[in-house]
Amino acid sequence: MTLLDQFNKWKETTLKKSLDKFKERKGRFETSAGIEVPRLAIPDGNEGRGPLALTVADENYVNKLGFPGEFPYTRGVQPTMYRSRFWTMRQYAGFSTAEESNKRYRYLLAQGQTGLSVAFDLPTQIGYDADDPIAQGEVGKVGVSISSIKDMEQLFDQIPLDKVSTSMTINAPAGVLLAMYIAVAKRQGADMRELRGTIQNDILKEYVARGTYIFPPAPSMRLITDIFQFCSKEVPYWNTISISGYHIREAGSTAVQEVAFTLANGIAYVEAALKAGLNVDDFAGQLSFFFNAHNNLLEEVAKFRAARRMWAKIMRERFKAQKPSSWQLRFH
């Protein structure tokens, strides 16, 4: 099969299926200079006269790059990426009290924001109540203070949790905050199986890059795999972890090291879940990632593409995952 054959097959299957579900936002996409941006570019073998001249198979091209929406997802997990749907837009926000942060969230949603991203203060991040002496001077400083279910109710007052997705940047006490969130949603009358959002829940990068851990590694990993198991059965649309390279890069790593350490952490989480008795395809589709977007554009593009391909191959070949959703590296 030639590269052209592969390209046409992609258009007739993967792309068509995607467009049948989500039409592109407009008929023509252009740069600021008015130059049309093609849906997909492939090598031109006919001196500028287009891809129809390609008649020789290029297995290396297909195996390494392929087409968006298909294994190994080097060029993206969605066939049209953001030509059909925008990413969820949410400003990282949270400060002072739950009541004050709630006002901010409702304002942001009224301005067109399509999701919420909760910033917690340091006492909350390391499991201290606001009235603990060690928390003095830090309550509500770099995020919102949450000590109780009442605080969580105030945080999401008048915000229907079954209609908005919520990202919570919380790690060591992630299970507690997620339980509070689900409880508030239930009190609102929501079905927890329909809830959408993300908890960061990446304790390994806290040990090496950031520092807001509470427990030793082994029990911390147990908490994380318990969350994997619970959510796979009860909250299937929730991203149970955001495996983070961002903080590793900010702590001084290179782009290559960022990908290496992040994927190593991802492998550790998958291995822990398998050791706990979970089936890989039951939880892998709920794993997400968080990478840095640094200054060198081409290096960052290459980093993202390499990470997608490596993760897809790790999940399919090393862990024998069968579902395409288990192979896809979804990140922000």
Where are these regions (language model features)?
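Extended amphipathic alpha-helical segments enriched in small hydrophobics
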Residues: 300-308
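Cysteine-centered nucleophilic/redox motifs
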Residues: 315
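Catalytic alpha/beta active-site cores
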Residues: 1-294, 299-300, 318-332
